[in-house]
A protein has these predicted regions:
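Bacterial N-terminal signal peptides that target proteins for export
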Residues: 1-8
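Charged catalytic cores and adjacent phosphate/nucleic-acid-binding surfaces used
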Residues: 2, 21-38, 57, 115-125, ...
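Hydrophobic h-region of N-terminal signal peptides that target proteins for export
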Residues: 11-19
Length: 359
């Protein structure tokens, strides 16, 4: 009877948790693709996390995500005195809940070593037990043999890189040469590593951003400091596991954290254009024009560097609009701005041209 009395409140809590409202996210789109909101790095009690696996699904559903990976550590099992070591347990527990709530659940594990090589997530694996190997390269090889996407986690984490600067070591270069490294975390938890943008560009790797959550997500990323968890935006052909995986290997990813978007140069411009619209001038006094600039996304767009005769700075609020007043010459000559919160490199942001729509 005691067991029954204990279990009933637990199941009621799970039901109430998952029945909460889902937050619908409005993010930039890449023409011809579906934007999947993803978090590929999180933990449960089956390694060093503090929550049961099904809670990760409930949190993801409420936060408006499309896909997640529970990536408990292979080598680090601080709860093993109380919870048996089972590298597939979290995925098995979370899978039926994910199916009920239309969350794509990627099977993954975190290979956990000292730097170098550091910590790496193996995503889309089938047999995590095969990653239990003394030799690091053998562990990665086993993951790759299963079709895994290998992500280098928090390369500037100060526990492993005291100065916070990510560096490529010989082992990482070897992984790249073998085709065994596919992405690097630009953003992890509450940290970002600017040099990762250049590393990914120079080595043709995907830019990744994840929460690395261990506790309750709403507590670790609580308002008003955080409006949402960090996430990877994946531009897939369809909302399926297969399309998700294809897009990640094709490096069609961006990272959304706070009010910022980090994306490769070739993706950044179309992403901006997908949410920003300039209207037809509604006033023209012969010297100046007035037109509206609107934003359909959750991300405010922060523009700077406007030339003489146009606003020096503009912030187009999330789901908002601003009126732009500029010299009439800009009817034929676009205004060039830097988008300060769309990052394309360690020292680079997106440059765009703004002009009113034609009648």
């Amino acid at each position: 009877m005691k067991t029954k009395l204990t279990l009933i409140p637990i199941f009621l809590l799970i039901t109430l948790t998952l029945s909460a409202q889902r937050h619908i996210l409005s993010v930039p789109e890449l023409p011809g693709y579906v934007t999947l909101k993803c978090d590929f790095h999180m933990h449960t009690v089956f390694s060093d996390g503090n929550v049961w696996p099904n809670q990760r699904v409930g949190e993801a559903w409420r936060d408006g995500l499309d896909a997640i990976a529970i990536t408990d550590h292979i080598e680090y099992q601080p709860h093993k005195q109380y919870i048996p070591v089972d590298h597939s347990a979290a995925w098995k527990i979370a899978s039926p809940i994910a199916a009920d709530y239309n969350i794509i659940l990627v099977k993954g594990s975190e290979i956990t070593r000292k730097m170098p090589p550091g910590h790496l997530n193996a995503l889309f694996i089938t047999e995590p037990d095969s990653l239990v190997k003394d030799d690091f390269m053998k562990a990665v090889e086993a993951a790759v043999a299963q079709g895994a996407f290998i992500e280098w986690n928090h390369p500037g984490w100060k526990s492993q890189q005291p100065d916070g600067i990510p560096r490529m070591y010989d082992v990482h270069r070897e992984l790249i040469a073998k085709g065994w490294l596919h992405g690097i975390e630009y953003y992890n938890d509450v940290e970002y590593y600017p040099l990762v943008m250049d590393m990914c560009r120079d080595n043709q790797l995907a830019i990744m951003g994840n929460s690395d959550v261990h506790g309750v997500i709403s507590e670790e990323f609580a308002a008003p400091v955080y409006s949402h968890r960090p996430m990877t935006l994946v531009f897939a052909k369809e909302r399926t596991m297969e399309s998700l995986k294809e897009a990640m290997f094709a490096r069609r990813t961006a990272v959304w954290y706070g009010d910022n978007l980090a994306a490769p140069e070739e993706l950044a411009a179309p992403l901006f254009q997908s949410v920003i619209t300039a209207g037809i001038p509604f006033r023209d006094d012969g010297k100046r024009i007035w037109f509206e600039l609107s934003n359909t996304s959750d991300i405010p767009m922060k523009l700077s560097g406007g030339p003489e005769g146009a606003p020096a700075t503009l912030t187009v609020p999330a789901h908002g609009m601003v009126v732009v007043r500029a010299d009439r010459k800009f009817l034929a000559q676009p205004v060039t701005y830097a988008v300060d919160n769309i990052i394309t490199g360690s020292n680079n942001v997106l440059k765009v041209e703004i002009s009113p729509a034609k009648k």
